[in-house]
From Swiss-Prot:
The lineage of its organism: Eukaryota, Metazoa, Chordata, Craniata, Vertebrata. Residues 191-253 form the t-SNARE coiled-coil homology domain. InterPro entries: SNARE, STX3_SNARE, Syntaxin, Syntaxin/epimorphin_CS, Syntaxin_N, T_SNARE_dom. GO terms for molecular function: arachidonate binding; SNAP receptor activity; SNARE binding. Belongs to the syntaxin family. This is Syntaxin-3. One of its GO terms (biological process) is long-term synaptic potentiation. It comes from Rattus norvegicus (Rat). It comes from the Eukaryota. The chain crosses the membrane at residues 264-284.
Length: 289
């Protein structure tokens, strides 16, 4: 009876262990499902930002091609800029959160962790790529707007250098160059465009500054990942070198081994021949006696 009780207890313990393993597997599966859900959401956000960037580039072109752009076009651009910033912040926060969880689980090396690292790296690089394109579009728009201001100032008889123009933009006061413009119809139109372009640049620079810290944050993350990947690549290259070196050494060893074997066979043959000759001499000597 006592033995039977011990068997039942042992069986129960085994069942409990199995249950724990099932619970761990279920918990891990649920966690990875949640992780992939976040990955998909973040990827869609990045794709949406990419679409918005292309739309913004079109609006930049429209604004630059019109002497006095439509207010609606500028409003559309403002809404688009706000949407890009909102989505970009959301993506940045998601990536930072993923990075934190990965660092916390760094002590446990597992297939899941490698998958999470890989997915996080891919998304981070994609995000930086999209935001770099956006930054390039903004800088291009600023330079072309600045060029338009410079041309309009020339129309009014005021020639400015790039340094002087930058000074005006940094001061936020276009009156530095527009205060003495002659009161004529052409000058008024030029003045209106100068002031409008100046406002566009001021608004744009505000957006660039807001995105700068976030961009640098993610860019640094990707740079660190790049160093990690470079280290991995370097280790792989070293490993390949070691393998090639070992292969060459093995070939040389086999060659030397083959040569040594040939020498050994020759020596054996010579010894056998000598022994044969010696035996023949002894035999003849005995026969003569």
């Amino acid at each position: 009876m006592k033995d039977r009780l011990e068997q039942l207890k042992a069986k129960q313990l085994t069942q409990d262990d199995d249950t724990d393993e099932v619970e761990i597997a279920i918990d891990n599966t649920a966690f990875m499902d949640e992780f992939f859900s976040e990955i998909e959401e973040t990827r869609l956000n990045i794709d949406k930002i990419s679409e918005h960037v292309e739309e913004a580039k079109k609006l930049y072109s429209i604004i630059l091609s019109a002497p006095i752009p439509e207010p609606k076009t500028k409003d559309d651009l403002e809404q688009l800029t706000t949407e890009i910033k909102k989505r970009a912040n959301n993506v940045r926060n998601k990536l930072k959160s993923m990075e934190k969880h990965i660092e916390e689980d760094e002590v446990r090396s597992s297939a899941d962790l490698r998958i999470r690292k890989s997915q996080h790296s891919v998304l981070s690089r994609k995000f930086v790529e999209v935001m770099t394109k956006y930054n390039e579009a903004q800088v291009d728009f600023r330079e072309r707007s600045k060029g338009r201001i410079q041309r309009q100032l020339e129309i009014t008889g005021k020639k400015t250098t790039d340094e002087e123009l930058e000074e005006m933009l940094e001061s936020g006061n276009p009156a530095i160059f527009t205060s003495g413009i002659i009161d004529s119809q052409i000058s008024k139109q030029a003045l209106s465009e100068i002031e409008g372009r100046h406002k566009d640049i001021v608004r744009l620079e505000s957006s660039i500054k807001e995105l700068h810290d976030m961009f640098m944050d993610i860019a640094m993350l990707v740079e660190n990942q790049g160093e990690m990947l470079d280290n991995i690549e370097l280790n792989v290259m070293h490993t390949v070198d070691h393998v090639e070196k070992a292969r060459d050494e093995t070939k040389r060893a086999m060659k030397y081994q083959g040569q040594a074997r040939k020498k050994l066979i020759i020596i054996i043959v010579i010894v056998v021949v000598l022994l044969g000759i010696l035996a023949l001499i002894i035999g003849l000597s005995v026969g003569l006696k």
